[in-house]
């Protein structure tokens, strides 16, 4: 039913969902992309998620191969660009790996969209969270930085820290200041900032960090 609905009402876009598609070898993923475009010639764009830790291991040449096979954009949940914050949330990646990942994707000709979580470092690391992310995107110049405000979930280590008083939540003002810091620290990059999610205080903000 979902495929039939897409064929009738879809706009030609395909999203390879549910995790870390780019964990596949570039050869296997290329085969999938080529098959998709052969089976559904009306496809106009293919997008995928990708974890920075995996993306950093893929060469620009391999990304160029994926681009030629039909992959147009990769979304990656960086959450932060601060090593201190990344360690706090057990992200399993470093800022250096994020930068390598982004540069490799861009060098391969694929659009790159990263996600930033205002508030994920708590009040103690709110400035560090914004500063670290700014440093990372200034190095990469991703096509998009998408805002996904942190929500601390029960049954997680960070939630336990919150209950114990070891993690103090950011205020809404803190989170907006983090976004403002990202905008102010942009160094001539052409990245578009997009805040369009229901968890965000600012739900309809979008613009170029260079021209708007």
Task: Kindly give the residue locations of the regions a language model identified.
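Conserved C-terminal portion of the radical SAM core fold
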Residues: 73, 96-158, 172-196
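Short, small-residue-enriched loops and turns at beta-alpha junctions
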Residues: 21-24, 52-56, 120-125, 153, ...
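Short, well-ordered secondary-structure micro-motifs
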Residues: 58-59, 87, 124-127, 157-160, ...
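Residue-level "edge-of-site" marker
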Residues: 49, 79, 118, 150, ...
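Radical SAM enzyme core and accessory elements
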Residues: 200-212
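Short glycine-enriched, charge-decorated loop/helix-capping segments at active-site entrances
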Residues: 87-92, 162-168
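Short linear capping/connector segments at secondary-structure termini
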Residues: 14-19, 117-120, 161-163, 198
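Conserved SAM/AdoMet-binding glycine-rich loop
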Residues: 2-107
């Amino acid at each position: 039913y979902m495929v039939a609905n897409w064929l009738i009402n879809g706009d030609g876009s395909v999203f390879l969902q549910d995790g870390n598609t780019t964990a596949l070898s570039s050869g296997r993923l290329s085969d999938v992309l080529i098959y998709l475009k052969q089976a559904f010639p009306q496809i106009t764009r293919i997008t995928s998620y990708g974890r920075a830790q995996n993306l950093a291991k893929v060469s620009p040449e391999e990304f160029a191969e994926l681009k030629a096979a039909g992959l147009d954009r990769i979304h990656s949940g960086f959450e932060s660009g601060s090593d201190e914050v990344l360690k706090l949330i057990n992200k399993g990646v470093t800022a250096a790996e994020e930068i390598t990942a982004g540069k490799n994707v861009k060098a391969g000709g694929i659009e790159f969209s990263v996600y930033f979580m205002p508030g994920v470092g708590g009040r103690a690391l709110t400035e560090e969270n914004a500063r670290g992310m700014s440093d990372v995107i200034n190095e990469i110049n991703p096509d998009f930085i998408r805002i996904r405000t942190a929500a601390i979930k029960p049954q997680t280590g960070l939630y336990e820290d919150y209950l114990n008083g070891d993690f103090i939540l950011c205020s809404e003002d803190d989170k907006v200041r983090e976004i403002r810091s990202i905008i102010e620290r942009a160094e001539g990059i052409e990245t578009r900032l997009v805040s369009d999610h229901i968890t965000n205080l600012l739900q309809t903000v979008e613009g170029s960090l260079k021209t708007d």
